[in-house]
């Protein structure tokens, strides 16, 4: 697993908060430093949230996005609706304007994908294909089931996440477009890498 989330050596103060809050216990402590056990991590971000020393670092994808913007390709943003939590007073229109000033060609809400996904869930329920359905919208949950609860794999809905559904729709409408997802979730980085 690439370094989506890593720990900065100099900042760790041995408080063990990350270890206590990790739902899958994928953090070990060695040589006065916390280390993420990559093969066990589900990228939920709890360690990042609870660290009082800012000792966690999330992979920076800005250089890759800048390269896309500089390539001359059409670049479309899929914007998670949670942006309103980080930018009080912002609307989709103000976000579109700001992102287009940065060079993006278009900005759409990931909610477009959520609508597609909702329709798929309705079909599964109406056709009674599965008695028990676990939503596949959260990549961390999907990863946790794959790694720790494989007996629950048959219950995962065979449906794309809203992000994937939206980006697929964008590429169907504009096959040459490159897509960039902007949202708060660390595990979405892995999801993007696993399903380009």
Predicted regions, residues:
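Iron-sulfur cluster-binding cysteine motifs and their immediate structural context
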Residues: 2-9, 13-37, 42, 46-62
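Iron-sulfur-associated redox domains of electron-transfer enzymes in respiratory
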Residues: 59-196
